[in-house]
A protein has these predicted regions:
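Binuclear metal-dependent hydrolase catalytic cores
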Residues: 1-57, 63, 67, 72-73, ...
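Structural beta-sheet core signal
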Residues: 57-58, 121
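Cap/insert and terminal regions of metallo-dependent hydrolase folds
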Residues: 65-153
Length: 158
């Protein structure tokens, strides 16, 4: 992406925008919210939402250093639903290391390591076609049926 679409500045938005620092853990009504710093060059936050015995971990813009990062696996262990960045193939990653995004195989390994009950791989490379994504998802599901690719408008029962 390039100007004027990227980067987007707060001043270019036609809305009142305010920013707040949030603590590592807090509540929004009955929902417990925990945060973890992501590994991304522009900074990013990973969120864990827990309510009524179910938990969701949202980890986009995340470039893990290994297939089982201890800090992330401890944070996400046993979550009901893991939404995890999986933008690149290993071949693409060679050219995009340190961009702040994971590979599909690494994200699959992490989902297994942290014991997520369901996983949706998200933050797909925008250059991929729907057909390419479907083929990649089919390959992943052969060995990991609880791991799927996230889709726009998708609903998941927890």
């Amino acid at each position: 992406m390039s100007p004027p679409l990227w980067p987007v500045t707060a001043g270019s938005l036609k809305a009142a925008v305010s920013f707040h620092d949030v603590p590592d853990a807090f509540f929004v009504g009955p929902v417990a919210v925990e945060t973890m710093e992501s590994r991304h060059p522009g900074g990013s936050t990973i969120y864990k939402l827990t309510c009524g015995g179910v938990s969701l971990v949202y980890a986009t813009d995340y470039e893990p250093e290994s297939d089982a990062p201890e800090d992330f696996c401890a944070f996400a262990r046993g979550c009901s639903l893991l939404l995890l960045d999986a933008q690149y193939s290993p071949e693409e990653y060679v050219k995009t290391r340190d961009f702040g995004h994971s590979t599909i195989p690494r994200s699959v390994a992490i989902a297994r390591s942290c014991g997520a009950k369901q996983t949706l791989l998200i933050h797909h490379d925008p250059k991929r076609t729907d057909g390419q994504l479907l083929a990649l998802e089919t390959a992943v599901r052969e060995s990991s049926p609880h791991i799927r690719f996230g889709r726009e408008g998708q609903e998941v029962l927890l």
